[in-house]
Amino acid sequence: MTETEFLALVDQVLDSIESQADDWAAGLDVDIEATRSGNVLTLVFEDGTQVVVNVQAAMQELWVAARSGGFHYRYDGQHWNDTRGGPRLPDALSQICSEAAGVPVSVRL
């Protein structure tokens, strides 16, 4: 995948996550603020918990920073897979954000 293709893909991913966070705020009454600055999306929850999704274009990865740790994801053409064998990106973000929100939320990509 070229860098241009990768950047277009991750732009869609970040837009999707940001939109879903807005939906949680409206539909589930989750107190969350989603802020995007270039290739970095920061989700801040009511208790101050931050989840940061960051694009690493040179490595063609998405990185997630959360209280539970740092995670790296690489796209295989269909899925964003954890480079260390953990859950895929949507499942991991769903779990991380559900814990921070205090209610079940689901990330779909």
From Swiss-Prot:
Q: Which domain of life is it from?
A: Bacteria
State any single GO MF term.
ferric iron binding
The parts of the chain that form a coiled coil are none
Against Pfam families, the record matches this protein to: Frataxin_Cyay
**Record-linked SUPFAM superfamilies:** Frataxin/Nqo15-like
GO cellular component terms given for this protein: cytoplasm
Q: Which UniProt keywords apply?
A: Iron, Metal-binding
Q: Which GO terms describe its biological process?
A: iron-sulfur cluster assembly
Q: Supply the InterPro entries for this chain.
A: CyaY, Frataxin/CyaY, Frataxin/CyaY_sf, Frataxin_CS
Q: What is this protein for, i.e. what is its function?
A: Involved in iron-sulfur (Fe-S) cluster assembly. May act as a regulator of Fe-S biogenesis.
Protein family according to the UniProt entry: Belongs to the frataxin family.
Name of the protein in question: Iron-sulfur cluster assembly protein CyaY
